[in-house]
A protein has these predicted regions:
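Active-site phosphate-binding/coordination module
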Residues: 1-79
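A general structural signal for well-ordered alpha-helical segments in protein cores
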Residues: 3, 43, 121, 125, ...
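Short hydrophobic/aromatic-enriched beta-strand-loop microsegments
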Residues: 13-19, 77-79, 136-138, 191-195, ...
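Conserved acidic, metal-coordinating active-site core of Asp-based
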Residues: 49, 55-56, 60-175
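Mg2+-dependent phosphoryl-transfer enzymes with acidic/Ser/Thr/Gly-rich catalytic loops
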Residues: 130, 145-229
């Protein structure tokens, strides 16, 4: 899977929500405890869009992301940042024919991502939403449109996890910085957008904290701990 080792080994981290809410892993048990896979029909429709648009495709199976060889070899050519390129090279498994690969595993996919230019995002979103059944479309970075099952999404999956742990939304806190975090931030009482987050994220969140480079998470936690005390 693509969960960084530093996250898996970080003290106190017991569960990890991945694939934009498509799955939950138990760190202690080392296995998946929840999943919401794409439907076969959705995958086949996504492949048709990929062939028409000729965009790079990523697919995730059991937490492992696969992508086209040229993209994994040089992500910066596809508008990835320098940091993003390192992450892509370290986590993505290259595939020669991504459409054939996706078709072969059509009933196993956690999620699908389209790598696109920023100016194509709105048009692509409209196409995906119109042409692919039973999906949830979101975005975490400017050059990606991410597709999951309609019942996925970080917010819905966080609610599932809270119920499992017998924690109410009034007792939960979440932090995020991108559009794909909005459903999570609005599903709990203490949902906080990072100061460096996207405009949509900051507008939607109940609270906004400082940036990630200025200890925004720590400041957000301390803000409400002081109120409790």
């Amino acid at each position: 899977h693509s969960i960084p080792e530093m996250i898996r080994n970080y003290p106190g981290v017991e569960y990890v929500i991945t694939a934009n809410g498509g799955a939950v892993y138990s760190v202690r048990e080392g296995k998946r405890v929840y999943q919401c896979l794409l439907e076969k029909e959705s995958v086949e429709s996504a492949i048709a869009v990929r062939k028409r648009e000729n965009m790079v495709l990523e697919v995730v199976i059991d937490g492992v992301p696969y992508a086209e060889e040229a993209y994994v070899k040089d992500p910066i050519q596809y508008l990835a940042t320098e940091y993003g390129a390192k992450y892509i090279k370290a986590t993505r498994k290259p595939v020669k024919d991504i459409c054939r690969f996706a078709q072969k595993h059509a009933e196993e996919l956690d999620s699908i991502s389209f790598v696109c230019r920023y100016e194509d995002k709105e048009r692509l979103y409209t196409s995906l939403d119109k042409e692919i059944p039973n999906i949830y479309v979101t975005s975490s970075v400017p050059n990606l449109m991410e597709v999951g099952h309609i019942d996925a999404g970080k917010g819905k999956t966080l609610l599932w996890l809270l119920k499992k742990l017998e924690i109410s939304t009034e007792e939960a806190m979440a932090f995020g910085d991108a559009d794909n975090d909005i459903s999570m931030l609005t599903s709990v009482k203490y949902g906080m957008a990072m100061g460096n987050g996207t405009e949509n994220c900051r507008k939607a969140a109940p609270y906004v904290t400082d940036t990630n480079e200025k200890d925004g998470v720590a400041k957000g936690i301390l803000r409400f701990l002081s109120e409790v005390e």
